Amino acid sequence: MRIILQRVNESRVEVAGQIIGRIEKGLNLLVGITPSDTDQEVAWMARKCLELRIFPDQSGKLSQSVQDIEGGLLVISQFTLYGDCRKGRRPSFDKAAPGAMAEQIYEQFVTKLRASGLQVETGQFGAMMNVYIENDGPVTLILEREAESER
């Protein structure tokens, strides 16, 4: 599982010109899924996203999590995070999970985040989306967790 995590002042996602998800201060999560991802990876990634201390306290020190600030999370599925560009001029997406499998794992991830009680908004799985992100910082991190069988 691979996530591009961005600290945002606000973020929204549109499908066919309609806003389907919007948050203010919080995290924008672009989520890539592989066929080997299991419940363990989903739980680890959800916990990591909720608990990472990347928001500043009053002194400016990065000591608060999205839970601490009661921020929102906008979660967007993005299979292109597993694009392999080493050969040729067109990326290969062979390492990305097939659609139905990826959607099931994505929904498990969203469910784990929602269990936190925070506002969790999503894109539309498999749709062409316009994602608007106002970065804060910018603070952008790449989170990766391979299944134990892949380590």
Curated annotation (Swiss-Prot):
GO process annotations (BP): D-amino acid catabolic process
Domain-related comment: A Gly-cisPro motif from one monomer fits into the active site of the other monomer to allow specific chiral rejection of L-amino acids.
Subcellular location, record wording: Cytoplasm
Keywords: Cytoplasm, Hydrolase, RNA-binding, tRNA-binding
GO CC terms of this entry: cytoplasm
UniProt record similarity statement: Belongs to the DTD family.
Record's protein name: D-aminoacyl-tRNA deacylase
Span of the annotated motif Gly-cisPro motif, important for rejection of L-amino acids: 137-138
Species this protein is from: Acaryochloris marina (strain MBIC 11017)
Assembly information from the UniProt record: Homodimer.
InterPro entries given in the database record: Daa-tRNA_deacyls_DTD, DTD-like_sf
Entry-linked NCBIfam families: D-aminoacyl-tRNA deacylase
Catalytic EC class: hydrolase
EC number: 3.1.1.96
Catalytic reactions on record: glycyl-tRNA(Ala) + H2O = tRNA(Ala) + glycine + H(+); a D-aminoacyl-tRNA + H2O = a tRNA + a D-alpha-amino acid + H(+)
Amino-acid biosynthesis as UniProt keyword: no
Coiled-coil ranges from the UniProt annotation: none
Its biological purpose: An aminoacyl-tRNA editing enzyme that deacylates mischarged D-aminoacyl-tRNAs. Also deacylates mischarged glycyl-tRNA(Ala), protecting cells against glycine mischarging by AlaRS. Acts via tRNA-based rather than protein-based catalysis; rejects L-amino acids rather than detecting D-amino acids in the active site. By recycling D-aminoacyl-tRNA to D-amino acids and free tRNA molecules, this enzyme counteracts the toxicity associated with the formation of D-aminoacyl-tRNA entities in vivo and helps enforce protein L-homochirality.
SUPFAM superfamilies (UniProt xref): DTD-like (SSF69500)
Pfam annotation, one family: Tyr_Deacylase
